[in-house]
């Protein structure tokens, strides 16, 4: 008989997001990790992998540095999750830049430009 998972992937993703956000604020001391916000977490059905989407304020260089810092802290953050969440297995973490906020800002700029051009004609 197969044991049912304790958490659904969506609930587990929310718990991981909350716990990692706490770890970034209180535990992670890497100077490369600047203004990082966890925007989303998705977990595979078997909970073996979690993709963590992050938004980083700053230049492309600062974003790359922050992502590098997060990737080097993956083991520490995974251990932190294991200590704070009662899971059978702790998912492998994969950090990705979330550029949706940048895209939304660019769309807003383009819409504002179109509006200015239409009102100016």
Regions from the PLM with identified roles:
Residues 1-49, 55-121:
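Charge-rich, low-complexity N-terminal segments
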């Amino acid at each position: 008989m197969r044991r049912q998972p304790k958490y659904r992937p969506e609930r587990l993703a929310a718990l991981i997001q909350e716990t990692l956000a706490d770890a970034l604020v209180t535990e992670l001391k890497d100077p490369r990790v600047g203004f990082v916000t966890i925007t989303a977490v998705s977990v595979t059905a078997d909970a073996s992998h979690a993709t963590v989407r992050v938004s980083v304020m700053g230049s492309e260089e600062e974003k790359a540095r922050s992502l590098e810092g997060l990737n080097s802290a993956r083991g520490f953050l995974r251990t932190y999750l294991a200590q704070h969440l009662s899971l059978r297995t702790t998912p492998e973490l994969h950090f990705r830049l979330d550029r949706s906020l940048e895209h939304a800002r660019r769309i807003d700029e383009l819409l504002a430009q179109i509006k200015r051009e239409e009102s100016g004609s």
